């Protein structure tokens, strides 16, 4: 990642970097962006440090920190009288940070204990861990998985019969983009994320109609984050009438931007991470349907950021 980013900046003389999906890759990009003072917008990677210890005036994010979607689920579970939880996640940055966010929210809201189980990334052989969960008998399980690994876990958890006795919860990435793959095994699953089906705002309806017309599929959270990256860049360019040499003014405008997003309006924190609503969703049919707002206007704590 550093080598390719360096080529884009030094050889191709790009004005703006936009990327990426994976937190590990974004680490390499951040290094070059900071060294060269190149404007950078992160449309997905949730690495806490990107708008924490590694924050910089020229670094912006339009998605989330790994802490952010998981923290409110802690209070949701504690408020339901759940006291002892087993957490399970891939043993890598995103998994560790998501579990830390959930644990912080859970204990703060009155939860008693979170016992952490881990599996190497991207391993998806869950049988031994499911057996261990059954023997521990917690009040609930909280997990962080995404993509194909998430789909397999949801199906394996249901097949093991655990959902009948031990409720399963997760960060929204557990079910986003994989509802076709998990089918009946995902029905009723509750997750927290910064986007949901059934928001029913005028803005979201317009976005969904335009997206399905262009791509013949329903938009997910990744589509919204990418769209908002475009809105943020446009806000900066509008403020300087397209003159990208006016870097200081452009960055200031992006920091003050109010993004009229399909997920709901949001603003930038001082560390340049979205201050946004986090929704509690439930899988109903082929939707991650809105249940309620789990946390209104949640800002990441931006630990270590000196901006």
Annotate each predicted stretch with a short phrase:
Residues 1-307:
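Extracytosolic ligand-binding ectodomains
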